[in-house]
Amino acid sequence: AASDVYKRQIDVVVPDVTYLSQNKEKIKGIFITHGHEDHVGGVSYLWPELGCPTIYGTPFSLAIARHKIEESGLPVKNMKEVNAGDVVNVDCFKVEFIKVCHSIAEASALSITTPVGVVFVTGDFKIDFTPIDNKLTDLERIGEIGKKGVLLMLGESTNVERNGHTMSERTVGESFDVIFGNCLLYTSDAADDLIGV
């Protein structure tokens, strides 16, 4: 579990990509479902090992990936922005980005049409009927894909091991309003050019 990793004070865990590295000519792209650290944090390690294939993701996810790559001193190249509903054709594969709710902007599921069937990758998601950006998980599109038939579903969801449901991000914002609504904020700075808060 991730908590065990933190207890050992390990800052970064990078998976063994030997097989991928030995077969990099077969890799046609890296597809990012969202911008959380556990999904893009290793891109600066993985990407050059695989010969810098095209990275596909939403604008926000790619901005985070771009920062990771720049931070490691590598030149940024081969990035393609996509939006929910877009389909990317890569060789014999079609990859559709589908809007899902998560605790970060522009999260996506992926529907990958292959010659032998559809692989559905949920990415991290939650069903949130009141998301702060008012963009709901595209349950209609997910249902359409399901009706056509899915060969394999790769599902993940933060806190899946807990009973019940996860509260809406909107609830978190409302809680902050209650907690901090009557607080007095005071800041000071000795700098002469302080404009103000």
Regions found by a protein language model. Give the residues of each.
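His/Asp/Glu-rich metal-coordinating catalytic cores
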Residues: 3-31, 36-188
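Positively charged, low-complexity/disordered segments
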Residues: 1-2, 189-192, 196-197
